[in-house]
Swiss-Prot record:
It comes from the Bacteria. It holds the Pfam family DUF2541. This is UPF0412 protein YaaI. Residues 1-23 form the signal peptide. Disulfide bonds: none annotated. Belongs to the UPF0412 family. Keywords: Signal. The lineage of its organism: Bacteria, Pseudomonadati, Pseudomonadota, Gammaproteobacteria, Enterobacterales. The keyword Signal applies. The keyword Signal applies.
Amino acid sequence: MKSVFTLSASLAISLMLCCTAQANDHKILGVIAMPRNETNDLALKLPVCRIVKRIQLSADHGDLQLSGASVYFKAARSASQSLNIPSEIKEGQTTDWININSDNDNKRCVSKITFSGHTVNSSDMATLKIIGDD
């Protein structure tokens, strides 16, 4: 009887942990090394097309300056959207959530995100981390 109770308790705890893990759907989509010179062709290609409703940007190493960003959706006509992003992100700073307006039912998936920008105030390359929320 004691083993049945222990087994039941273990299953209940693992179900709670499972559901807790699924409540937070934030995923690191990737990291981009930002060059020291202004570049407009920095791309994060997602190997698996993901439905992403919003993103956060984080400067993990070094300060960076951004001049633009676009999201490309997997669609027959290669739809894209320009994003309203902050022009500067300091090391250790994370932006607020940036909404991605996919179609009305949020079923379009993101195939790539492009950035224009560069590292500032450093001889090392800054790194830009992209976090997605689906």
